[in-house]
Amino acid sequence: VQQTADGEVIVMHDSNLKRTTGLDKEVWQVTWDEIKDLDNGSWFDKKYQTVRIPTLEEVLKVCRGKIHLNIEIKPSGHDKDLEEQVAKLLKKYHMRDTCVVSSLKYDSLRKIKQADDSIETAYITSVSYGNFTDLKYADGYSVESTLLSKSFVNKAQKAGKQIYVWTVNSEERLEKVVGMGIDNVITDDPVMAKELIYEQEHSTFWDRYVKQLLQIGK
């Protein structure tokens, strides 16, 4: 999530609006009224030309009681109480226990915890070494999948931290990170991930052994 010039909290991956809307401006430079009617879907497929940029509040209304959310905070340096606004919205929609708030900026996690200590947080990092496990404002760590190590998972979990892994889009990679004992996975293919994890949880040793033999023969 990011914040517009007039303080609206919106759901947008890029800091610049050009790739998805055609407007070559940073999110923090525009007001909500300037962008709320922009076509935010045609870049992906023409059938999505009616898709608009959602606010965080709109997303929470749709998702409440249905799914858990991982909300990444992307501060621009021009924000006005972005973290506090996120915390207030989670409280308003009674979603503090069904969301995790993550960020590359550790200071954003500090602000979230100071606003509402009950909200779960995750520190996004592209490395899995060093003394990360004692960061008090991070309840977990979100690590790039190819850099994850079993020793880091063990160390973090021993310290009471959750492990999130991103972005896992192949069965081979998913099997590897699940085997390390991770707690959560971020993927563009949730159906694949759900089916594979279900299969692993309900299959026997011999099921997995036969599957490996069949793969060797391919």
Task: Tell me what each language-model feature is.
Residues 4-5, 77-81, 107, 148, ...:
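Short alpha-helical
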Residues 8, 13-120, 143, 157-159, ...:
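Metal-dependent phosphodiesterase/phospholipase catalytic core, i.e.
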Residues 1-3, 71:
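Conserved metal-phosphate-binding beta-hairpin within the catalytic cores
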Residues 46-50, 122-218:
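C-terminal active-site rim and adjoining tail of enzyme catalytic domains
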Residues 4-9, 177:
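A glycine-centered beta-loop-beta connector
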Residues 4, 20-21, 55, 167, ...:
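Ser/Thr-centric signal marking residues that sit
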